């Protein structure tokens, strides 16, 4: 069930005074959900806070930049934690395998795989993993407890000096609550034998506050094979002073194991061998854990962030069945174990330049990935019988950036920035020929313009260079670990260049809309083929598109939101008709209606449209579009709240994802090219009971 509604209480006042009070509270760093009435004799009313209603005119650096949070999350039914990011306009989160695996993400014509060009930070700690056993930029959000997320700040495009690796399509920063207005215990039961329990509370300490949250989820899911999910999450956050220094410390712990069904071949369903929710290999699944500690410290004019994380993943997969080995099958295990350390230093300031007022931003970042196990094994019934590759890798990155914003006039802001990233790495492989070390660096200019056309309207133009890193093994590999053939070393830092123009309109009375046109070109999109343990480059690409995003607060209780995006992507240098980027969905749309009543009723109705996509470069094979509708309603009375969610309300038989490739089923004499798809969940009903204290 969607979390309970978030609200603040205070004496009645005009809408203008409410907006001013909220703006002052946010600017002062006061938690808007904790502002309480000071006049106990006044009549109390609720004010619902929507992150998308926060006024960004005069402060945002681009039209596509935004904030989501507060009631944006608490009124939204979520099928999976990755759908938190579907509040970012144009973003889609799907799944092509089990629930313990990172989601598949789509944005701006990118199939982001598991996060390759969209970076995420949780309390200052990077979520994406470099040189990962399954996918470069692997972004697993399963360690996050949705009820504790206060807000997400997002940016799109490579226009910002403080965003680096994996940020070509965009970046996001997630912040958890410092304190809760009330503690709660929440129990959810649902279809597929699902049980989920969340407990959270906060309390004051001598010099600050301490928040804790615990989550347990188990489910067998809605597929033909029981998923047997067992997930445990914990969070402990301290906000206050340490040795007189304003600080935040966040400790998270995540552990999960699961069984999964992978995408299945269309021919097996058409022949009646399996149904849409069936499976070919019953041994797929995995286990993972992540234990992290991050901290933020205010050191005078400087802000310091530091983090450390211990991570493990074992993933059993088999997308091709018996294509490569008719006797043992093609099942394999990917294993990743690492330690991650890093931090950043940031300073904001102000200065005069040729009589112009200016704001400055300077910073530095360091990150070290110590990947101790980076392995690929052939398996049979989950048991290893052959090693394809066993590697370890150490990857160090250093970054520095500077950005200045000049107030050319009362209406015009100009921003210039420069960023440099340096990466050094060392790889030790099972095959000595694939061992080695190297380094690379990249300089990235950034530019921005914002012009206030009117009190309620602002124009933006942005341009910048960015990059994504690739699996460092690609730079030193000399021998294909499967075929034994010679391979060519690849670049580690792949540059991209992008620009956008757009408008932001906000009438300051509950209605805002943004319109953006963008283009993004990359030099290459190096793809790591996890089941073969190899890496290969694609041709250069170009994507362009438009995005529309609108939010309207009809009154204090009822809001509507709508977003739509269209993106076209092609490989550069290839002839027309043979240059489509596969699995790059052109059209995406979402709409929602949310109501938070005065009598304890909260309701939400949401629609998500995911357009069709080419599965081959010549568009001869296409994935069909999909439309899903989710709904939720809850009723709060005293300290209690009960509710129900319906996910995929109309039980649409759509697909989450589809691919086109060769596979061979047991009993087939040769390989067959086919669509392999993973269906969306059928209708799921969840009931929730919450007690607040």
Where are these regions (language model features)?
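C-terminal beta-signal and adjacent terminal beta-strands/loops
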Residues: 4, 560, 612-614, 634-693
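Short acidic/polar hinge/loop motifs at secondary-structure boundaries
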Residues: 126-156, 174-175
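Transmembrane beta-barrel wall of Gram-negative outer-membrane proteins
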Residues: 184, 189-218, 223-261, 284-296, ...
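Face-selective signature of the C-terminal outer-membrane beta-barrel domain
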Residues: 241, 245-254, 286-430, 450-452, ...
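Gram-negative outer-membrane beta-barrel transporters
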Residues: 347-350, 409-410, 414, 422, ...
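Short strand-turn segments of transmembrane beta-barrel domains in outer membranes
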Residues: 153-161, 170-203, 214, 221-222, ...
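Membrane-embedded beta-barrel scaffold of Gram-negative outer-membrane proteins
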Residues: 199, 296-299, 303-319, 452, ...
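Extracytoplasmic beta-strand/coil segments of soluble accessory domains associated
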Residues: 82, 86-129
């Amino acid at each position: 069930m969607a979390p309970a509604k978030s609200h603040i209480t205070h004496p009645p006042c005009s809408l203008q005074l409410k907006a001013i009070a909220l703006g002052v509270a946010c600017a002062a760093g006061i938690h808007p959900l904790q502002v309480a009435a000071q006049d106990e004799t006044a009549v109390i009313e609720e004010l619902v806070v929507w992150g998308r209603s926060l006024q960004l005119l005069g402060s945002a650096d681009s039209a596509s930049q935004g904030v989501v949070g507060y009631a944006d999350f608490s009124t939204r039914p979520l099928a999976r934690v990755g759908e938190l990011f579907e509040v970012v306009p144009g973003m889609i989160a799907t799944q092509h395998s089990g629930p313990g695996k990172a989601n598949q993400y789509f944005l701006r014509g990118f199939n982001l795989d598991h996060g390759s060009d969209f970076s995420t930070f949780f309390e200052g700690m990077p979520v994406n993993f470099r040189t990962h056993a399954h996918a470069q930029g692997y972004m697993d959000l399963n360690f996050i407890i949705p009820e504790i997320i206060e807000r997400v700040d997002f940016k799109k495009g490579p226009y910002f000096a403080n965003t680096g690796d994996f940020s070509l399509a965009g970046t996001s920063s997630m912040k958890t609550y410092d304190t809760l207005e009330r503690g709660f215990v929440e129990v959810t039961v649902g279809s597929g034998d699902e049980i989920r329990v969340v407990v959270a509370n906060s309390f004051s300490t001598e010099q600050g506050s301490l928040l804790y949250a615990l989550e347990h989820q188990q489910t067998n899911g809605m597929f033909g094979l029981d998923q047997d999910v067992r997930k445990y999450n914990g969070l402990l956050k301290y906000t206050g002073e340490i040795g007189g220094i304003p600080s935040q410390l966040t400790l998270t712990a995540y552990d999960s194991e699961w069984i999964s069904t992978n995408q299945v071949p269309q021919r097996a369903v058409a022949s009646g061998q399996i149904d849409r929710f069936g499976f070919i290999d019953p041994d797929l699944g995995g286990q993972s854990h992540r234990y992290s500690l991050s901290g933020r410290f205010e050191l005078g004019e400087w802000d310091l962030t530091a983090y450390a994380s211990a991570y493990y993943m074992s993933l059993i997969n088999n997308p091709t069945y018996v294509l490569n080995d008719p006797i043992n099958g093609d099942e394999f295990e990917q294993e990743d174990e690492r330690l991650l350390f890093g931090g950043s230093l940031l300073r904001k300031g102000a200065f005069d330049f040729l009589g112009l007022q200016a704001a400055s931003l300077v910073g530095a970042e360091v990150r070290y990935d110590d990947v101790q196990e980076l392995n690929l094994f052939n398996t049979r019934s989950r048991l290893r019988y052959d090693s394809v590759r066993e590697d370890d890798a150490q990857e160090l990155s250093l970054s520095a950036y500077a950005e200045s914003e000049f107030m050319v006039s009362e209406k015009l802001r100009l921003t210039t920035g420069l960023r440099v990233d340096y990466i050094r790495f060392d790889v030790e492989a099972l095959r000595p020929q694939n061992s080695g070390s190297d380094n690379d660096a990249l300089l990235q200019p950034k530019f921005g313009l914002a012009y206030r056309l009117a009190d309620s309207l602002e124009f933006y133009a942005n341009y910048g260079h960015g990059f994504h890193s690739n699996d460092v093994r690609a730079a030193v590999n000399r021998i294909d670990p499967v075929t034994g053939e010679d391979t060519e070393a690849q670049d580690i830092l792949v540059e991209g260049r992008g620009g956008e123009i757009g408008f932001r309109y906000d009438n300051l009375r509950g209605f805002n809309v943004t319109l953006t046109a963008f283009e993004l070109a990359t030099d290459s999109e190096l793809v790591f083929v996890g089941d073969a343990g190899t890496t290969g480059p694609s041709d250069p690409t170009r994507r362009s598109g438009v995005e529309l995003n609108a939010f309207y607060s009809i009154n204090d209780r009822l809001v509507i939101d709508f977003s739509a995006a269209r993106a076209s992507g092609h490989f550069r240098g290839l002839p027309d008709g043979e240059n489509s980027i596969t699995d790059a969905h052109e059209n995406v749309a979402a709409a929602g209606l949310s109501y938070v009543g005065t009598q304890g009723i909260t309701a939400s109705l949401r629609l998500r449209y995911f357009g069709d996509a080419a599965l081959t470069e010549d568009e001869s094979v296409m994935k069909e579009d999909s439309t899903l509708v989710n709904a939720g309603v809850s009723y709060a009375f005293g300290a209690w709240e009960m509710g129900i969610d319906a996910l995929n309300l109309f039980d649409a038989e759509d697909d989450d994802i589809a691919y086109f490739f060769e596979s061979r089923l047991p009993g087939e004499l040769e390989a067959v090219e086919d669509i392999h798809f993973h269906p969306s969940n059928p209708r799921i009903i969840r009931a929730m009971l919450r007690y607040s204290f």
